[in-house]
């Protein structure tokens, strides 16, 4: 009898548990439970005991107790982020012996109740811990962190830490990634990271550091120091082993000079943008001539930026960003050792000239950004920059360049010259005036922008034997395009822009460009287009703000199979006579941009939306015109008859009067 009673009690218990479980609004899939944003005030106690992943983020939890959390001993992933947790019961996570990932981000752990709770306690198997966004401050952090021998990733971002000491990261021998971004760190005590022998990734961005005077983390591979107030960066003078650093971010600081990085031979990524850097133009100075850190820092003596240090400094560097600095000149010696460099950004500086004339200079460089400087001269050697594919020169003052400046770049594919004063030469038979630049015969070039260069005449053969796929000649008011100026591009050109040039006549036989997909003729004074009588590849046609009144089917018929988008705003379109356009609108073959706002005019000058025009409207208009013509003809004939009749009567009367007098 007794076993039967026990069995009945067990069944009742299971039934009640199942009933309560059904009431829990959490989503359960296999061993994963999601209780996100449910307004929960405490950890649910009726979840499956074998749950391995529990997401309680976005609720209103204020305290974490050992019970019921300790019931879920199989937990591996626990997300408690974005709650209001300010109390952790001692040993709250002690029963979770399998826990590997714990997130307490964006809570209130800095409140006094968290202090009295004794911190997190030991986390023997946790590999990932997120404590970001808790207003944690120095001193409290040491009391909150417990023993975590397996911890690999720790996030302390978006807190209020001001100082790191030797004791901050104790008992974390396996830590590899440490995120401290967006704190208020001003001081890092010597040896603060000595207890982290496996640390490879360190993020110290968005803090208040002013100097790195004795960098000695040989094992570190990624270091982010961006968005601080760093005035100097110096490695240890006698490191115990070779530095492994490959990625260094120092952007948005206050560096006045290029740091001496000869001790970092493995560096492949270096970002120094948004600083105050000027490169030295003379011989190296002694340490007295170099900017020293602000007072309050016991920095080692700083050496001049070195390009000739032992070995080959920066010889493995692939990416260098020096944009938004105050560089006026690039010394020849600066580029000598950058033999592996692939990407160089020097935009937004004060450069007036750039030279790369030496044989083999920057042999691996693929992208060079010199945009938005004050460049007036550009000298590129015949065998320099042999791998360069992209050259960005927009926003400079280039003019009167050597004619074959770009023809010497054997691998050049993309060239942006927007906002300069470059004048293209003609073809081999029409070279052009002095100071023009040759764009013909550059067999590798695919994309060219000559926007806003004050070009007056585009000569015949300007791009002969240069298989461009994209050409932008916009914003050159008064541009005259000579017959044959785009000759040689018929089989390659896919994108052509001639916007804002004031063109009245287009001397380009567009139907011959069989690969053309996008054509921009906006903001000109065109009223006619050449006839596309055969099928072509054109998909997008921009005719905004021109003088088109009619787009007859005889001229546009060849576009029906390919055209997908047509821009026509700002043209004096006729409501009648545009049968081809109306058919495209009503049948939906072509997407005419903003069709509801596309206005056309009837002969009576009445303006309506083109999408509202029906064929019968034009038929009625035609009937009205015919009736008007008939009426006018009748009135004219009647007037002639009446005039003739009056004249005859007058003659007869005169004859009658003469006979009567006689």
From Swiss-Prot:
It comes from the Eukaryota. InterPro entries: Leu-rich_rpt (IPR001611), Leu-rich_rpt_typical-subtyp (IPR003591), LRR_dom_sf (IPR032675), LRRNT (IPR000372). CDD domains: LRR_RI. One of its GO terms (biological process) is negative regulation of activated T cell proliferation. LRR repeats lie at residues 50-73, 74-95, 98-119, 125-145, 150-171, 174-195, 198-219, 220-240, 244-265, 266-286, 316-339, 340-363, 364-385, 387-408, 411-432, 444-465, 467-488, 492-513, 515-536, 537-558. PANTHER family: IG(IMMUNOGLOBULIN) AND LRR(LEUCINE RICH REPEAT) DOMAINS (PTHR24366), TIR DOMAIN-CONTAINING PROTEIN (PTHR24366:SF161). This is Transforming growth factor beta activator LRRC32.
